[in-house]
Amino acid sequence: MSFKATITESGKQNIWFRAIYVLSTIQDDIKITVTTNELIAWSMNETDTTLCQVRFQKSFFEEYEFKPHEIVFGENGVQVIEDTYGNSHKLYSFRVNGRHLTTISRKPDGDGIKSFTIAVNNTSTCPESLANRLIVVIEMDSLIVKEYCPQFQPIKYDPIIINLKYKRRFLDVFGTAASDRNPQEPLDPKLLDVFTNTERELTSALFNEEVESDIRKRNQLTAADEINYICCNSTLLKNFLDNCNVNVTDEVKLEINVHRLSITAFTKAVYGKNNDLLRNALSMSNTISTLDLEHYCLFTTIEDEKQDKRSHSKRREHMKSIIFKLKDFKNFITIGPSWKTTQDGNDNISLWFCHPGDPILMQMQKPGVKLELVEVTDSNINDDILEGKFIKTAISGSKEEAGLKDNKESCESPLKSKTALKRENLPHSVAGTRNSPLKVSYLTPDNGSTVAKTYRNNTARKLFVEEQSQSTNYEQDKRFRQASSVHMNMNREQSFDIGTTHEVACPRNESNSLKRSIADICNETEDPTQQSTFAKRADTTVTWGKALPAADDEVSCSNIDRKGMLKKEKLKHMQGLLNSQNDTSNHKKQDNKEMEDGLGLTQVEKPRGIFD
């Protein structure tokens, strides 16, 4: 055999089947390139706007062998290349029908696949019927062996190294920014691992002779060096794309700054010749915080570097935007979840993009598999990269420090009053109540010449108001009337208490069972230091809560109201006892009088008439 590769694990079989299907949706023909270390399956559409490439490492297959020196038939597909170290490598490329290969690779429903093998036998001993044919052998769990031999056409491999160029620029721009970063703001160790793995990949790549390193300092960067990088969990994007119908929405827009990532699926309106609406415009979007992303590196510009340092909060954050097609992107995202059991649990997707109109590179990596998608973007976006004069790079920091900083900022409530925060320093002051954020603020002159911004007082608002309540002095008049009414009530109770003391003096021997006398209770009510606030039924009001006085020597209103009501109930009880005693004494006097008079005639005597 010139080439042979076997897959026995079910998870690897699923990702192989899914990758072949996605490649067939881009182009009917799939190109396969075989090297000593990997198998590359790729396809490009007819308009050259989408390129999908899947690299299967040698370790992905349980059995992998490649003997290019034995190839006799189809020698047009053999190539010899040299790497950066001067070592020669042979590879073999051919093109096969993707529809046929997808149908062959489809997993049956009622039976499992024990092993899946693809092979090429273009040696001198192969029969003519198997020359330039891809041999596909499938062994089922039911001991059934299926063998297919679709024909292929040998081709030359013309590598498209957009991925290597983007990654080299990524290291040149942000690798130097990471080295010049402030030691007090360290980078995420995972991001440093990304830099290391990218450098290792560029070093071991076979087609990197055209990729040149141009490492420069931050102050030497230009607008042409722009490169942006985003890394997040593929589930964040997949959950959104599952709700998008490719027949309704055909484009995707990504917008990102240092605070949030917004992904929008939309379709533009289509009008006919007579300005008739043929298709409505539709869009749906989702916003993700940058704290939920793994890493991000943004390339922006600023107008003034000194002003940026002085007023960081006031400057406008630059938003990076990119637009590309939805269909291929959605199919590409669905390859990752087909492999359910991952060894390292890496479900991240990485994106590199430059200016609008330049291709966008997407990459997902599994153990032994690397999936890449390149799409041409829309150039009809107003990019503000040339507005500024100074280049600025934004790199995501450590997740732990970002989480602590976010927690500190979130602990402080935006509605908390400053007076309440300083209450500990002012023991005898009243804590400031929280003002409603919906109340309209107005300007009132202070004691000095300056004008201070204040809020309206927390006055009670009734559902049913009187005309007098709309006046400005209504609150003061109301407080005066309440104070006068309380004073009158206190005078009435005091006069009542004085009158009752004389009545209680007579039957004092009958009320010995009571613990406290009425006179004592009256004396307590006459004590001005223990005047109580009388509880009354409040009106129906809509108002904000008001804090109680924070002084320690004052008694709470609830305790005062409770004591006052208790004293009132005792007075009522004593008055009831006195009334009942008076009633019983009156009944006894009447009974004694009747006993003294005796019982008389029950009928009044009348003279009898003539007819009686």
Curated annotation (Swiss-Prot):
Keyword Chaperone: no
GO biological process: cellular response to ionizing radiation; DNA damage checkpoint signaling; DNA repair; DNA replication checkpoint signaling; meiotic cell cycle; meiotic recombination checkpoint signaling; mitotic G1 DNA damage checkpoint signaling; mitotic G2 DNA damage checkpoint signaling
InterPro entries in UniProt: Ddc1 (IPR026217), DNA_clamp_sf (IPR046938), Rad9/Ddc1 (IPR007268)
Keywords: Cytoplasm, DNA damage, DNA repair, DNA-binding, Nucleus, Phosphoprotein
Compartmental location: Cytoplasm; Nucleus
Annotated spans, Disordered: 576-612
GO cellular component: checkpoint clamp complex; condensed nuclear chromosome; cytoplasm; nucleus
Compositional bias segments (type: Basic and acidic residues): 585-596
Modification note: Phosphorylated during cell cycle S-phase and in response to DNA damage. This phosphorylation is MEC14 dependent. Also hosphorylated by CDC28.
GO molecular function: DNA binding; protein kinase activator activity
Main location (coarse class): cytoplasm
Phosphoserine carried by residues: S436
Function: Component of the checkpoint clamp complex involved in the surveillance mechanism that allows the DNA repair pathways to act to restore the integrity of the DNA prior to DNA synthesis or separation of the replicated chromosomes. Associates with sites of DNA damage and modulates the MEC1 signaling pathway and the activation of RAD53 in response to DNA damage at phase G1. The complex also physically regulates DNA polymerase zeta-dependent mutagenesis by controlling the access of polymerase zeta to damaged DNA.
Family (UniProt): Belongs to the DDC1 family.
Additional observations: Present with 238 molecules/cell in log phase SD medium.
Subunit (UniProt): Component of the checkpoint clamp complex composed of DDC1, MEC3 and RAD17. The interaction with MEC3 is performed in a RAD17-dependent manner. The checkpoint clamp complex loads onto DNA in an ATP-dependent manner through its interaction with the RFC-RAD4 checkpoint clamp loader complex. Interacts with the DNA polymerase zeta subunit REV7 and DPB11.
Protein name per the record: DNA damage checkpoint protein 1
Organism: Saccharomyces cerevisiae (strain ATCC 204508 / S288c) (Baker's yeast)
Lineage: Eukaryota, Fungi, Dikarya, Ascomycota, Saccharomycotina
